[in-house]
Protein backbone atom coordinates (compact mmCIF):
# COMPACT_ATOMS: atom_id res chain seq x y z
CA UNK A 1 0.00 0.00 0.00
CA UNK A 2 1.35 3.44 -0.90
CA UNK A 3 1.86 5.96 1.81
CA UNK A 4 2.26 9.68 1.31
CA UNK A 5 4.15 12.05 3.52
CA UNK A 6 4.40 15.81 3.28
CA UNK A 7 7.80 17.19 4.15
CA UNK A 8 7.36 20.86 4.97
CA UNK A 9 10.12 23.34 4.36
CA UNK A 10 11.29 26.15 6.59
CA UNK A 11 9.93 29.05 4.52
CA UNK A 12 11.92 28.14 1.48
CA UNK A 13 13.27 24.91 -0.05
CA UNK A 14 15.81 26.28 -2.40
CA UNK A 15 13.06 28.08 -4.23
CA UNK A 16 12.86 30.90 -1.76
CA UNK A 17 16.25 32.04 -2.90
CA UNK A 18 15.34 33.87 -6.07
CA UNK A 19 13.88 32.71 -9.34
CA UNK A 20 15.58 32.51 -12.68
CA UNK A 21 14.45 36.04 -13.46
CA UNK A 22 15.87 37.45 -10.22
CA UNK A 23 12.40 38.33 -8.91
CA UNK A 24 11.50 38.34 -5.24
CA UNK A 25 11.37 34.84 -3.82
CA UNK A 26 8.30 33.12 -2.46
CA UNK A 27 8.24 30.11 -0.16
CA UNK A 28 7.16 26.67 -1.30
CA UNK A 29 4.33 24.91 0.50
CA UNK A 30 6.13 21.58 0.83
CA UNK A 31 7.08 18.33 -0.88
CA UNK A 32 4.97 15.26 -1.37
CA UNK A 33 6.87 12.02 -0.98
CA UNK A 34 5.55 8.65 -2.14
CA UNK A 35 7.48 5.72 -0.70
CA UNK A 36 7.30 2.14 -1.92
CA UNK A 37 8.69 -0.94 -0.17
CA UNK A 38 12.25 -1.82 -1.09
CA UNK A 39 13.99 1.36 0.03
CA UNK A 40 15.36 2.50 -3.32
CA UNK A 41 16.72 5.97 -2.50
CA UNK A 42 15.27 7.35 -5.73
CA UNK A 43 11.71 6.50 -4.68
CA UNK A 44 11.78 8.29 -1.34
CA UNK A 45 13.08 11.60 -2.65
CA UNK A 46 10.70 14.59 -2.63
CA UNK A 47 9.16 15.41 -5.99
CA UNK A 48 11.41 18.46 -6.43
CA UNK A 49 14.47 16.19 -6.41
CA UNK A 50 13.29 13.02 -8.15
CA UNK A 51 15.64 11.73 -10.89
CA UNK A 52 15.06 13.41 -14.26
CA UNK A 53 16.02 11.81 -17.59
CA UNK A 54 17.67 14.96 -18.86
CA UNK A 55 21.25 16.26 -18.93
CA UNK A 56 21.86 19.62 -17.28
CA UNK A 57 22.94 22.50 -19.49
CA UNK A 58 24.08 24.57 -16.50
CA UNK A 59 27.43 26.20 -17.15
CA UNK A 60 30.57 25.35 -15.20
CA UNK A 61 32.83 28.37 -15.70
CA UNK A 62 36.07 28.09 -13.74
CA UNK A 63 39.72 29.10 -13.96
CA UNK A 64 42.76 27.77 -12.12
CA UNK A 65 45.72 29.83 -10.95
CA UNK A 66 48.27 29.14 -8.26
CA UNK A 67 46.67 25.81 -7.48
CA UNK A 68 43.28 27.39 -6.68
CA UNK A 69 40.26 26.86 -8.94
CA UNK A 70 37.61 29.59 -8.79
CA UNK A 71 34.44 30.24 -10.73
CA UNK A 72 30.72 29.66 -10.97
CA UNK A 73 28.41 26.66 -11.16
CA UNK A 74 24.96 27.26 -12.64
CA UNK A 75 22.61 25.03 -10.65
CA UNK A 76 19.56 27.24 -11.19
CA UNK A 77 17.74 24.34 -12.86
CA UNK A 78 15.51 26.57 -14.92
CA UNK A 79 14.44 28.69 -11.96
CA UNK A 80 12.27 28.00 -8.97
CA UNK A 81 9.07 27.17 -10.83
CA UNK A 82 10.74 24.76 -13.28
CA UNK A 83 13.33 23.06 -11.09
CA UNK A 84 11.23 19.97 -10.27
CA UNK A 85 11.44 19.02 -13.96
CA UNK A 86 15.13 19.80 -14.37
CA UNK A 87 18.16 17.64 -13.49
CA UNK A 88 21.07 18.10 -11.14
CA UNK A 89 24.30 19.65 -12.39
CA UNK A 90 27.16 17.12 -12.07
CA UNK A 91 30.75 18.33 -11.66
CA UNK A 92 34.15 16.64 -11.67
CA UNK A 93 36.36 18.70 -9.34
CA UNK A 94 39.49 17.02 -10.71
CA UNK A 95 38.99 18.49 -14.18
CA UNK A 96 36.76 21.44 -13.30
CA UNK A 97 34.24 20.31 -15.89
CA UNK A 98 30.57 19.43 -16.07
CA UNK A 99 29.83 15.73 -16.38
CA UNK A 100 27.12 15.22 -18.96
CA UNK A 101 24.98 12.52 -17.40
CA UNK A 102 21.29 12.64 -16.56
CA UNK A 103 20.02 11.88 -13.07
CA UNK A 104 19.30 8.26 -13.95
CA UNK A 105 22.73 7.58 -15.45
CA UNK A 106 24.40 9.39 -12.56
CA UNK A 107 23.20 6.67 -10.20
CA UNK A 108 25.63 4.24 -11.88
CA UNK A 109 28.38 6.70 -12.82
CA UNK A 110 31.67 7.17 -10.98
CA UNK A 111 32.73 10.13 -13.15
CA UNK A 112 31.28 12.94 -11.04
CA UNK A 113 32.29 14.28 -7.63
CA UNK A 114 29.45 16.61 -6.61
CA UNK A 115 25.94 17.38 -7.82
CA UNK A 116 23.96 20.57 -7.33
CA UNK A 117 20.34 21.55 -7.88
CA UNK A 118 19.05 24.76 -6.32
CA UNK A 119 20.14 24.44 -2.66
CA UNK A 120 20.47 20.65 -2.75
CA UNK A 121 24.08 19.44 -2.75
CA UNK A 122 25.30 15.86 -3.08
CA UNK A 123 28.45 13.80 -3.28
CA UNK A 124 28.93 10.67 -5.37
CA UNK A 125 28.65 8.14 -2.59
CA UNK A 126 26.15 6.54 -0.24
CA UNK A 127 22.55 7.07 -1.34
CA UNK A 128 23.53 9.38 -4.22
CA UNK A 129 25.89 7.25 -6.30
CA UNK A 130 28.48 4.47 -6.57
CA UNK A 131 31.56 6.69 -6.59
CA UNK A 132 32.54 6.03 -2.97
CA UNK A 133 33.21 9.73 -2.37
CA UNK A 134 33.16 10.91 1.23
CA UNK A 135 33.06 14.39 2.69
CA UNK A 136 34.46 15.94 5.86
CA UNK A 137 33.18 19.31 7.08
CA UNK A 138 35.91 21.61 8.40
CA UNK A 139 34.96 24.86 10.21
CA UNK A 140 36.95 27.48 8.29
CA UNK A 141 36.24 30.93 6.90
CA UNK A 142 38.72 30.59 4.03
CA UNK A 143 40.24 27.93 1.84
CA UNK A 144 43.71 29.01 2.96
CA UNK A 145 42.96 27.79 6.49
CA UNK A 146 42.79 24.19 5.29
CA UNK A 147 46.27 22.97 4.41
CA UNK A 148 45.80 19.26 5.05
CA UNK A 149 42.91 16.84 4.93
CA UNK A 150 41.41 15.72 8.24
CA UNK A 151 42.16 12.15 9.22
CA UNK A 152 38.59 11.38 10.31
CA UNK A 153 35.03 12.67 10.06
CA UNK A 154 34.18 11.60 6.50
CA UNK A 155 30.59 10.68 5.61
CA UNK A 156 28.60 9.93 2.45
CA UNK A 157 25.07 10.94 1.50
CA UNK A 158 22.44 9.29 3.66
CA UNK A 159 18.90 10.51 3.04
CA UNK A 160 17.10 7.18 3.41
CA UNK A 161 16.39 5.85 6.90
CA UNK A 162 16.48 2.16 7.84
CA UNK A 163 12.69 2.04 7.56
CA UNK A 164 12.73 3.66 4.10
CA UNK A 165 11.77 7.17 5.15
CA UNK A 166 13.16 10.38 3.67
CA UNK A 167 15.71 12.21 5.84
CA UNK A 168 16.10 15.93 5.12
CA UNK A 169 17.92 18.98 6.36
CA UNK A 170 15.69 21.76 7.79
CA UNK A 171 15.21 23.39 4.36
CA UNK A 172 13.63 20.20 2.99
CA UNK A 173 16.52 19.04 0.82
CA UNK A 174 17.58 15.38 1.01
CA UNK A 175 20.26 14.89 3.67
CA UNK A 176 23.75 14.74 2.19
CA UNK A 177 27.30 14.75 3.48
CA UNK A 178 27.26 18.55 3.14
CA UNK A 179 24.79 18.60 6.04
CA UNK A 180 23.10 21.90 6.95
CA UNK A 181 25.47 23.90 4.80
CA UNK A 182 23.68 27.26 4.86
CA UNK A 183 21.98 29.75 7.17
CA UNK A 184 18.58 31.04 6.07
CA UNK A 185 17.50 34.65 6.67
CA UNK A 186 13.73 34.65 7.21
CA UNK A 187 13.43 38.41 6.76
CA UNK A 188 15.49 38.71 3.59
CA UNK A 189 14.40 35.30 2.26
CA UNK A 190 17.99 34.53 1.35
CA UNK A 191 20.62 32.02 2.33
CA UNK A 192 24.29 32.31 3.14
CA UNK A 193 26.87 29.51 3.20
CA UNK A 194 28.22 28.65 6.63
CA UNK A 195 31.94 29.32 7.22
CA UNK A 196 32.94 25.80 6.28
CA UNK A 197 35.32 24.04 3.92
CA UNK A 198 34.32 20.63 2.56
CA UNK A 199 37.09 18.09 2.04
CA UNK A 200 36.09 15.47 -0.51
CA UNK A 201 37.93 12.15 -0.38
CA UNK A 202 37.93 9.70 -3.30
CA UNK A 203 38.47 5.97 -3.14
CA UNK A 204 41.94 6.39 -4.67
CA UNK A 205 42.97 8.55 -1.71
CA UNK A 206 42.97 11.90 -3.54
CA UNK A 207 41.33 14.79 -1.70
CA UNK A 208 39.93 18.16 -2.69
CA UNK A 209 39.00 21.07 -0.41
CA UNK A 210 35.93 23.02 -1.58
CA UNK A 211 34.47 26.28 -0.28
CA UNK A 212 31.13 27.78 -1.27
CA UNK A 213 31.68 31.53 -1.51
CA UNK A 214 28.10 32.53 -2.26
CA UNK A 215 24.78 31.14 -3.47
CA UNK A 216 24.22 34.34 -5.45
CA UNK A 217 27.22 34.41 -7.76
CA UNK A 218 25.62 35.99 -10.84
CA UNK A 219 26.98 39.54 -10.85
CA UNK A 220 24.44 40.61 -13.48
CA UNK A 221 21.51 39.30 -11.37
CA UNK A 222 22.61 39.48 -7.72
CA UNK A 223 19.43 37.89 -6.33
CA UNK A 224 19.50 34.94 -8.72
CA UNK A 225 19.75 31.94 -6.43
CA UNK A 226 21.63 28.68 -7.11
CA UNK A 227 24.31 30.40 -9.19
CA UNK A 228 27.16 29.26 -7.00
CA UNK A 229 30.50 31.00 -6.73
CA UNK A 230 32.99 28.44 -5.45
CA UNK A 231 36.68 27.79 -4.97
CA UNK A 232 38.63 24.60 -4.45
CA UNK A 233 42.12 23.16 -4.30
CA UNK A 234 43.59 19.69 -4.31
CA UNK A 235 45.23 18.63 -1.07
CA UNK A 236 48.43 16.61 -0.67
Regions found by a protein language model. Name each.
Residues 1-6:
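Bacterial N-terminal signal peptides that target proteins for export
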Residues 7-11:
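Hydrophobic helical h-region of N-terminal Sec-dependent signal peptides
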Residues 14-16:
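C-terminal motif of bacterial Sec signal peptides marking the signal peptidase cleavage site
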Residues 18-21:
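Bacterial signal peptide processing site
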Residues 23-25:
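Low-complexity, compositionally biased segments in intrinsically disordered regions
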Residues 30-236:
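Surface-exposed, beta-sheet-biased, low-hydrophobicity segments with strongly acidic/polar composition
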